[in-house]
Amino acid sequence: MSKKKVLILSDHALSTSGVGTQTRHLITGLLEKSDNWTFRQFGAALKHSDYRTVIVNEDFIIKPIDGFGDRESLRIALATEKPDVLLIFTDPRFFIWLFEMEDEVHQICPIAWWHVWDNYPFPDYNKPLYQATDAINCHSYLTYEMVSEHFPNKTKFIPHSIPKNVFYPLEESETLNYKKQILGSDREDHFVGIWVNRNAKRKRPNDVLLSWKNFLDQLKIKHGHRKATLILHTDPNDSEGPNLLVTAEMLGIQDTIFFSRDRLEFDKMNILYNISDFCLNISYAEGFGLSTLECMQAGSPIIALKTGGLTRQVVDHRDGTENGVAIDVACKSLVGSQQVPYIYEDYAKCEDVADAIFKLYSMNKTERSELSKKVKDYVDSEFAYKSTIDLWDESLTELCANWKENYERWECKTY
């Protein structure tokens, strides 16, 4: 049987972005599963340092591009590569040009989409995009609930997942040694949190620092010390966000903050997750929240707002228990723009975040150990890498076999 060729438009699969790493895991997993697939990717970024084609292997080839491509480059790829599937994976606003030429794409192949939408209400303004797509695989359950209600026959839930050998618990002695190496021996007994996000408004970085200050105040009042460190894996000087160095100094917490500024490989990130007692995410709009899943796979609990894709991570949907602390939404704001006319933003109170941190701090060693096992078991069950790969294999196989029967071509009738 000849291999089916998939043309992917997403972040460069060898980049460190969430979309990039998930693209890499997906391609690698499908190639390891069977010999049925071969992949070509337009690897997106704002700018690349090297535009030479990357041949990972004969079935995994990446062409770096600025942005997510354009009509002409896609037309050339469709004509020369003749893919069996076009797979897109990122915010739909980057692909409006593609949806406008979906009739040209469908002369060659179907369109699959690994999709996420951050929040309610259902985006009626996206209906033309959904109608133009042949398979909508949602990586957050909230997105699946919204879209499947309107397009049940082509919508599936296929969550993000990570190979087990990427993030995993380290031995306790090894973790302690890394903790002393990275944070210093003077912080050996510190309670450690980690925040892994871009320093941008949506991620609420200043509110993270304010929440941390509130926690430290509680710690000082109730225990007489501030033996705690928050790792911020971000650029404190990112132009998209506030100057976190100045904010930390204003709040008087600069001595409790540790900035991890460099892009790190998986093994280094695994160490950071292991030396952390929890991972925090309070973004007001979060489609999935990959860092919290990564941290849970390393055995550390999370503190997360019950919004978007975070809800199914922080709350065990099977019994309602929490994989750390789930924070209730304190305020919903209906916002919008010309391209996205309406969508909710969800906000947590900084006081609730501080209380959540203190709740985890107050657990004894046995309780923390049990929680660590719980979060690791939950990831292994509900975000299993093998399951994600199997579901994608089934979805793409079914799509290649049946898409022409289900595709409704537009017809222009004149009278």
Give, region by region, the residue ranges found by the protein language model.
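Nucleotide-activated donor-binding/catalytic signature segment of Leloir-type glycosyltransferases, i.e.
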Residues: 241-263
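C-terminal amphipathic helix plus adjacent low-complexity
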Residues: 336-346, 350-415
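Aromatic "clamp/platform" in nucleotide-sugar-dependent glycosyltransferases that forms part
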Residues: 284
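Conserved donor-binding/catalytic core segment of Leloir-type glycosyltransferases
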Residues: 8, 186-203, 209-212
